[in-house]
């Protein structure tokens, strides 16, 4: 490639609009999906009808760290 090729004043400048495709706001928005009745399984129905939500259940090991005595010196913290 000729080293003077970039400096040639006769060469037309090519500009590319990279954001031109995003001018229409519909292109960047997510498409709305249709919901079928088959999308709801028995697990979803169990939580809606009155079953225990997974967010209300306490993890089995939630009291694990509370079983240990605190043997740290907290005087430097307070």
Swiss-Prot record:
Sorted UniProt keywords: Auxin signaling pathway
One GO process term, biological-process aspect: auxin-activated signaling pathway
Tissue: Expressed in siliques and anthers.
Function, in words: Mediates responses to the synthetic auxin 2,4-dichlorophenoxyacetic acid (2,4-D). Not involved in the response to indole-3-acetic acid (IAA). May interact with RUB modification-related components and may regulate the culling-ring ubiquitin E3 ligase complex (CRL) activity.
Protein name: Small acidic protein 2
Origin species: Arabidopsis thaliana (Mouse-ear cress)
Annotated gene: SMAP2
